[in-house]
């Protein structure tokens, strides 16, 4: 269903009926390149995250939450539309990595903006009287495709850029972002938090949806000097001090949002979500230690292994989500749009995700497969591929050489044992479903390169990024 049809269908009577009752608010806080183990509530012991941990303690923590892609723009598109990247055409970070003319396959170009024909959750919720804002990183197109062109009433700080402006010290003003004034030395996470809090305070008497995608903790690393120094003094080579300071700044931002909800007296009718767009960067930073450690998950950003797509996810809604809930059901970034619509009493239209309301209220989700399609080489060394997870089983098909890797995630969450030879029955079943899904969404595949260099060096992979030989 196209955008205009969707809005016409849901307009009119639904708006007036919904406006007569107290509605729930929605806040979605998105971290950038945040690792699956970067929070205390997920086992991190090197730095603290008391505010995000508070959401988990007072709400729910998910153990099998996934981004729809191992890089940023496609996952962002999936969040705001509820549709898989292969369906929206945004399959790589925008504008994407060019195809290597000597590589074994030619990779397709990603869409360089989210099509205006797509329906965003801002547009869907607008039909029920919601006011909406996007505060922070957008990275779904340039002018003409900004948040305010996609149904959001307010855009602060979002444009075509995928990383923080670099006119000065990383994450510090001055810099140029839409509707965001930054003086010399202003710290970007704090500026964005101030804007987000301002939107909450201005709309505390009206239903609202706040999409709050931080630029943090994306490269280049940057934080306050005193916070970096504090971590350098205690890191002792075990972790990246600047990254740790960035995580704590992110947590402080979440704390600012929670305090704003408490002051406004609307915490009990606000669903708040914290999530990341892809896995953490698992290579060395300036301190010669890994920027983050996704262990026990394999690899990181840019890879279809668990370290590239498994994410931290915590949600809170007082009176609805039981405090301390742990949810093991596999969920995906396509699920947030229908979840918001479900709680708001709005039909979501055509989406690939499902509402998470059942598991948030003590029930279960119907079994379903989850899909990934990333037909590109990533800047982090990832290969073009597609994947499917159904139950405990996960199959990855690599496009360049056709190899397949099959894992039982219940027994092997680190993806060390490739069971493709031992369980060909499972592999055939998953492959058939993956093929059918790709056909249904019109997924664009890489093509064999007739000009491929047989000596093409490819990426120099090491450690857990190397292919997994089949187990005998």
Residue locations for each model-derived region?
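C-terminal cap/loop subdomain of S1 sulfatases and analogous C-terminal strand-loop tails that border
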Residues: 154, 280-304, 321-325, 329-409, ...
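Long, internal low-complexity/basic segments
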Residues: 7, 21-24, 31, 35-36, ...
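Short, structured active-site-proximal loop/turn typified by the sulfatase FGly-forming signature C/S-X-P-X-R
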Residues: 45-77, 82-87, 131-133, 153-159
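A short beta-strand-to-alpha-helix junction
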Residues: 44-49, 66-71, 108-119, 182-192, ...
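Formylglycine-dependent
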Residues: 90-131, 138-210, 214-225, 229-244, ...
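Histidine-centered active-site microenvironments of extracellular/periplasmic hydrolases
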Residues: 47, 146-151, 220-223, 259-320, ...
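N-terminal secretory signal peptides and thylakoid transit peptides that target proteins
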Residues: 1-13
């Amino acid at each position: 269903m196209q955008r205009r049809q969707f809005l016409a269908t849901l307009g009119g009577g639904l708006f007036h009926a919904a406006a007569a009752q107290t509605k729930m608010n929605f806040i979605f806080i998105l971290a950038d390149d945040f690792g699956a183990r970067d929070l205390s509530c997920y086992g991190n012991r090197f730095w603290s995250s008391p505010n995000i941990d508070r959401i988990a303690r007072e709400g729910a923590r998910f153990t099998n939450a996934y981004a729809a892609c191992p890089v940023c723009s496609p996952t962002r598109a999936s969040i705001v539309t509820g549709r898989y990247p292969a369906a929206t055409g945004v399959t790589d970070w925008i504008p994407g990595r060019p195809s290597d003319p000597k590589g074994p396959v030619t990779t397709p170009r990603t869409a360089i903006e989210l099509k205006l024909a797509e329906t965003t959750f801002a547009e869907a919720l607008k039909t029920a009287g919601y006011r909406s804002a996007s505060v922070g990183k957008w990275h779904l197109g340039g002018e003409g495709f900004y948040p305010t062109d996609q149904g959001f009433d307010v855009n602060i700080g979002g444009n075509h850029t995928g990383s923080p402006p670099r006119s000065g010290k990383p994450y510090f003003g001055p810099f140029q972002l839409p509707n965001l004034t930054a003086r010399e030395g202003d710290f970007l996470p704090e500026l964005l938090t101030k804007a987000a809090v301002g939107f909450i305070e201005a709309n505390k008497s009206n239903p609202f949806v706040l999409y709050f995608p931080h630029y943090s903790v994306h490269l280049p690393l940057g934080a306050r000097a005193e916070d970096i120094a504090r971590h350098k003094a205690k890191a002792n080579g075990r972790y990246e001090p600047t990254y740790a300071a960035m995580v704590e700044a992110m947590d402080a931002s979440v704390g600012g949002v929670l305090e704003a909800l408490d002051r406004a007296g609307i915490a009990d009718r606000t669903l708040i979500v914290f999530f990341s767009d892809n896995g953490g960067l698992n290579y060395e930073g300036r301190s010669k230690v890994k920027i983050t450690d996704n262990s026990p998950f394999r690899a990181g950003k840019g890879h279809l292994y668990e370290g590239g797509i498994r994410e931290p996810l915590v949600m809170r809604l007082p009176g609805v989500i039981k405090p301390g809930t742990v949810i093991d059901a596999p969920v995906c970034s396509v699920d947030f749009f229908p979840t918001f619509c479900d709680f708001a009493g709005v039909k979501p239209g055509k989406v690939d995700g499902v509402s998470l309301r059942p598991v948030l209220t003590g029930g279960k989700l119907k079994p379903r497969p989850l899909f990934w399609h990333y037909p590109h080489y990533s800047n982090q060394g990832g290969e073009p591929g597609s994947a499917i997870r159904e139950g405990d089983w996960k199959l990855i098909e690599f496009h360049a050489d056709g190899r397949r890797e099959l894992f039982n995630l219940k027994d092997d969450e680190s993806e060390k044992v490739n069971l493709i030879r031992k369980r060909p029955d499972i592999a055939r079943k998953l492959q058939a479903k993956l093929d059918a899904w790709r056909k249904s969404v019109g997924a664009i595949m890489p093509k064999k390169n007739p000009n491929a260099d047989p000596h093409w060096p490819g990426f120099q992979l090491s450690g857990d990024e190397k292919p997994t030989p089949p187990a005998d």
